[in-house]
Structures are given as C-alpha cells and as structure tokens.
Regions:
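A short, well-ordered alpha-helix in the C-terminal region of glycosyltransferases
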Residues: 230, 343-357, 366
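Membrane-proximal helix-turn-helix segments that form the acceptor-binding/catalytic region
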Residues: 131-154, 162-163
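Short hydrophobic beta-strand element within catalytic cores of glycosyltransferases
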Residues: 301-305
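Conserved acidic donor-binding segment of nucleotide-sugar-dependent glycosyltransferases
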Residues: 316-328, 336-342
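Nucleotide-activated donor-binding/catalytic signature segment of Leloir-type glycosyltransferases, i.e.
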Residues: 246-264
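Carbohydrate-associated surface elements
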Residues: 159, 180
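Aromatic "clamp/platform" in nucleotide-sugar-dependent glycosyltransferases that forms part
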Residues: 284
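Conserved donor-binding/catalytic core segment of Leloir-type glycosyltransferases
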Residues: 154, 190-221, 234
Length: 390
C-alpha cells in the first residue's frame, strides 16, 4: 500500500467534529509515518482552507453537510481524467467513512473501498426529521449493505461489529480495530490523589448534541444535590445543543453547580479530567467511547449506559466503570462511587491500567493490516489488535 484516500463528512477542525473524525485522522497520521501518501477529502466550513496539510495528510475540502458526498464523488470522477482537486490521487485503497451515510466511493473508483462504520445510527436519525430520517436509515440499513456486499468493513468495537452483522454484513468481512489514545501531555497533570478537587466532582467529556444525552448527567446531579450539597459537574466540550443544556441546568436549579467549559485545549482537558472523581458518559449511542479511555488515563472510572452498545466494550462493568440502564441507576451509581473513596480508587486504577493497552500506533498498525489485505483482494475478520512495531 503506497497511497490511501480517506473520505469523511467532517474533519477534526469542523465545529461539529468528534471522535470518529479523530480516529480517521490519527489513522491517517500513522499511515503517513509509514511513508504512505494519504489524502483526506471532507466538507468545508467557515474559515477552513480548501486545501492544507495536517500531520502529513493532504486535506481537500468542499461541500456541506449533505453536498460533501456528491462533490467528493464528482472529484473522484474528474481525477480519473486528470482534472479537479483530487487529480493525481491514485489510491491503492479507500476508507469510506459511513457516519450514517457512506460516500459509495466504490461506484466511481477502481481502488478497493473499506467501509468504516463507528456505530449504527438508527436511534439518531429521528433528529434529522421524519422524511430525512427514514431515507437515511434506509440508505444505512438497506442500500449500503447491498451496494457494499463484497466490500471489507472496518469498525471500532465488538458491539458495532454485531450491529453490522444484524444488517446483513457477513462476519467474514468485518474487522474490528479499536480506538487508540494519545499520551497525557507532558505539561499536563496526571490524575492522582493530590490532583482531585476537595469537593465531589463529576466530569462529562463530550460533544454537546442531543444523542449524547447530557441532560441525564444534569438530572443525576440534581438527584444527588440534596445528599451531596457540594457536588460539582464539569462539562467539557461544545456543540449546537449547548444553550439547551444550560437552560436545562437552570430549570433543574443546579446552574451554580455546573460549569460549561466549552472547547478547551488538550492541556486544559487533561487538567479537568485529572481533578475529577467520576466520569459520566450518558450517550444514547457510542461506537467505542474514546472519552472513557481518556478519563481512565487519570484513574477516573466511567458510569455509562449499557444500551449505548459501544460502552460495553470500552468499560469493563464493575471493574473499570459501571454500566447502568436508566437515569435513576446512573445517579445511584455515581452517588455510590462518590461516597466510597476506596472502591472508586480501586476501580480508577483498574481503568488506568486498561487505558495503557491502547495507542494510536497500535490502531494504525491494525488498520494498515486491513488495508493491505483489501489491496490484495482479501478480507479480514475479527478483532485486529497488533502490538506496536519495535
């Protein structure tokens, strides 16, 4: 494999970029470190240049939320005759990221396409409206599996692999390469007894969008406030749903206990995680839950929903965190951890130990294995978990 094309509806610089975009760009950076030429085609957004180079990746941007797809396909078609923004791009493999909707790159390119799916979007489509939601789910659940019936699939967790199989994708074509994690920055504190706040502090690290259900974290704090008067909640991240969440905090009477930090840099993010006692991730759906591992790097256990599917892979229930089924159980689990420092510390240290198992180098190596096999016309299946190259 000498050249790879990455297709994704957003990049990490996009105001709504998140964990799925981070996964793809980290993989791209690992591939460039191998000497592979990597191009990322994605959507534009205000202030973003049409072309730039980031971590060795050539980034090409055009289109918006929905037009990014046809414009990418048009660019691929033009590239075949030496025209357009992707002229000169001759990939040996393509990663076609399906965030609900794939690019269907295989229709216009001769290179083998690997379909990257972080998780299914059935629960998220209703936010787009009834008509768009029904069309989107039909594309994701019916059209895409049919069009890609011979393609390699790549996903980030075992539960997501099960979801793909339920949509009719053969298990023999589903490879799982889990997320990595970046080391805690050298200039940031690492979670320890001396970094924790004096007052009980819960942290949420997430994009602020409806399916992340941050309302449930607010509700849990409201339930616990009478019993734990000094309880604090730090919300790290931003998104178009932020104002609704701030209104919700006021309605619950806990605005004075909640700090919305918005987007922060890496050092500040880790500083906030290092001072927390418990991390809450109440998402309706997660492919993996990168925030679980980032909190774990600081010895902070996570409480999240079993129904999110992906968290059943990133959290070892009862060991590195707690899986629950509703907001009442969420509040109870958080309260129990806040009340029991010994149990919280043991669980946090187990989480920290597990976090050391994940690195972007390993993720990059695993994805390279999948791409190399696809370039040879072979399929890869199961959990791909290579150790770093010495």
């Amino acid at each position: 494999v000498r050249e790879v094309l990455l297709l994704c509806w957003r990049d990490t610089g996009h105001p709504q970029g998140g964990g799925s975009e981070r996964y793809l760009e980290q993989v791209g950076a690992q591939l460039t470190a191998r000497g592979i030429k990597v191009t990322l085609r994605t959507a534009g957004y205000p202030g973003a240049p049409r072309r730039e180079r980031i971590d060795g990746i050539d980034v090409s941007r055009a289109g918006g939320r929905y037009t990014v797809y046809p414009r990418a396909l048009a660019a691929l078609l033009l590239a075949r005759i030496g025209l357009g923004p992707l002229r000169g791009v001759r990939p040996d493999a393509v990663i076609d990221t399906q965030n609900g909707i794939p690019f269907f790159a295989g229709v216009v390119t001769r290179a083998p396409s690997v379909v990257l799916v972080h998780h299914g979007h059935r629960e998220q489509w209703p936010v787009a409206g009834r008509l768009v939601g029904r069309i989107g789910w039909w594309i994701e659940s019916r059209l895409s599996p049919r069009v890609h019936r011979d393609n390699q699939y790549l996903t980030v967790s075992l539960p997501s692999a099960e979801e793909l199989a339920a949509l009719g994708v053969d298990n023999s074509r589903i490879a799982v390469v889990r997320n990595g994690a970046e080391p805690v920055p050298a200039d940031a504190p690492t979670g320890a007894a001396e970094t924790r706040t004096d007052e009980p502090t819960v942290v949420v690290l997430s994009r602020l969008v409806p399916h992340k259900q941050i309302e449930d974290a607010l509700a849990a704090v409201a339930r616990l406030r009478d019993r734990i008067p000094r309880l604090r909640l730090d919300v790290i991240g931003d998104g178009w749903w932020a104002d609704n969440l701030k209104d919700n905090a006021r309605e619950l009477g806990i605005a004075d206990a909640v700090t919305f930090h918005g987007h922060v840099d890496e050092r500040r993010k880790h500083e906030l995680l290092a001072r927390a006692w418990v991390h809450v991730l109440p998402s309706r759906k997660e492919g993996w839950g990168l925030a679980v591992i980032e909190a774990a790097q600081h010895g902070v256990p996570t409480v999240g929903y079993r129904s999110s599917r992906g968290l059943t892979d990133s959290i070892v229930d009862g060991a590195t965190g707690v899986l629950v089924d509703d907001v009442a159980q969420l509040a109870d689990a958080v309260g129990e951890l806040l009340d029991d420092p010994a149990a919280r510390t043991v669980m946090g240290e187990k989480a920290r130990s597990r976090a050391r198992e994940f690195s972007w180098e390993q993720t990059g190596n695993g994805v390279y294995e999948v791409l190399a096999a696809a370039a040879r016309g072979e399929h890869t299946a199961g959990l791909i978990a290579p150790r770093p190259v010495d």
